[in-house]
Amino acid sequence: MWGVSSLDYDDDEELTRLLAVWDDEPLSLFLMNTFLLHQEGFRNLPFTVLRLSYAYRIFAKMLRAHGTPVAEDFMTRVAALARDEGLRDILGQRHAAEASRAEIAEALERVAERCDDRHGGSDDYVWLSRLLDLAPNYRQVELFQLLEKESRGQSRNSVWHLLRMDTVSATKFYEAFVSGCLPGAAAADGSGGGGSHYTGSRAGVSPGIQFGIKHEGLVKTLVECYVMHGREPVRDGLGLLIDPTSGLLGASMDLCFGVLKQGSGRTLLVEPCARVYEIKCRYKYLRKKEDPFVQNVLRRHDAAAVASLLQSHPVPGVEFRGERETPSAREFLLSHDAALFRATLKRARPLKPPEPLREYLADLLYLNKAECSEVIVFDAKHLNDDNSDGDATITINASLGLAAGDAAGGGADHHLRGSPGDSPPPIPFEDENTPELLGRLNVYEVARFSLPAFVNPRHQYYFQMLIQQYVLSQYYIKKHPDPERIDFRDLPTVYLVSAIFREREESELGCELLAGGRVFHCDHIPLLLIVTPVVFDPQFTRHAVSTVLDRWSRDLSRKTNLPIWVPNSANEYVVSSVPRPVSP
């Protein structure tokens, strides 16, 4: 279904059985069982290879326990490395005092055959870890790319859930950084592990989250057609991208552009200037079309109307703060524009920023306050309407779907729109040319304009996007032919998309929705998108990443009594993220 050999998330019984395999031997227990008696040289084994060895072991146990092959491409590639004669020779020479080459080869063959190792076979994974450490770096990166491929489908994919167990994911990073809560470092006895993580992974039961799941596909199409103007995104989505430099950080992304699935293995290639769009559907703003604030947006379609809509909720979607004031962490958008948003100011003094963030918050606010959001207002109507109400004539763009009048030529920021030549001219609607549009509700652009709102670097979503950008950047850096000459402008960028919908009126009930040439069966109609660019400070990213990696490695070392080494490539990220000095 998603191009992976994994089980459907909807099969609760099967997924529960697979998670039970992980619960039976969590990462910490695997490390103690495997390496406590082989600590000589363990300090030199990076966590990246330990993570790969553990993933292979869990998938092999799944096959033996349930007879279901999981992550077969990954398993096949690791088995091929285990049988690599060159790597076996090097391993035998380096560890001749511990075992003969024949003994090492026999152990690695048992691993490749996925044999039952309950009878003293844990040493096999010592040799597998050492062998993976000898493999070229690009081979290790390819294995992490295969894990991403095997986890596509995200919450519907069992591999995605399993990999998240031992990952500080983008959604967990904020708590790991601010409060030191480390969900990936499971207890050594396995308690409190699988159940709690599994519940968190399946938290899509609230109305707001269900609303986002149902409408995410439509929002992706709107971004593709009206923000990126037809640029091809990653089709069928991405799985869990695990940072190949640490093996610990991970990110699951909603929508990516400039990332290709290449070769027969369909692994990822990150191109220069890739873009990530993090989508947030604002369930709390779902209103009827006759709501006065919705009508105000559709009639006036300007920043003041949108600001009024955002302020109509008891907890406004944009928080106003003065230039020198500290924001709260309640909402993910901020504004310094008193004329539009001063009414959102609360007299209660906000809490102080958490200690790890306090030193950097002013700089992060300074970097982001110069950015401006772009608002795109939408409406939908039947194409056989006579437009007698004075609405703009609807035209159809040959590649992008629908537009209203010349709204597509409005005053949008160039960095969000692309060059003027990206889109072909609109084609007038004719019944005989487009019969498939009749009887459907067709989404079209009403207007677009700027909104003085920027991202709140104190909110947890900022940290979620920070890790998305960091992990994707590491894949770009690792695959770059000349990393020392990377242009910082070629690294991935991130945008936050806030999507607001309205309810259908009576005449719209039961009609299919058409957007970007695709049919959707959504219960609601898109009202507007707010697209906000996000700016990161490489120095702060290094600080945040280093803090979490250090905490996690110390915590797991304490629980396992092993010297866990989690590599940290944040310095290399900083070098690639800042302009190079001008040559004299």
Curated annotation (Swiss-Prot):
The record marks 216, 254, 278, 280 as: Required for function. It is found in: Host nucleus; Host cytoplasm. Residues 409-429 are annotated as: Disordered. GO terms for cellular component: host cell cytoplasm; host cell nucleus. Its EC number is 3.1.-.-. SUPFAM superfamilies: Restriction endonuclease-like. InterPro entries: Herpes_alk_exo, Restrct_endonuc-II-like, Viral_alk_exo. It holds the Pfam family Viral_alk_exo. GO terms for molecular function: DNA binding; DNA endonuclease activity; DNA exonuclease activity. Keywords: Endonuclease, Exonuclease, Host cytoplasm, Host nucleus, Host-virus interaction, Hydrolase, Nuclease. Plays a role in processing non linear or branched viral DNA intermediates in order to promote the production of mature packaged unit-length linear progeny viral DNA molecules. Exhibits endonuclease and exonuclease activities and accepts both double-stranded and single-stranded DNA as substrate. Exonuclease digestion of DNA is in the 5'-> 3' direction and the products are 5'-monophosphate nucleosides. Additionally, forms a recombinase with the major DNA-binding protein, which displays strand exchange activity. Belongs to the herpesviridae alkaline nuclease family. Interacts with major DNA-binding protein; this interaction increases the nuclease processivity of the alkaline exonuclease. This is Alkaline nuclease. It comes from Human cytomegalovirus (strain Merlin). The gene is UL98.
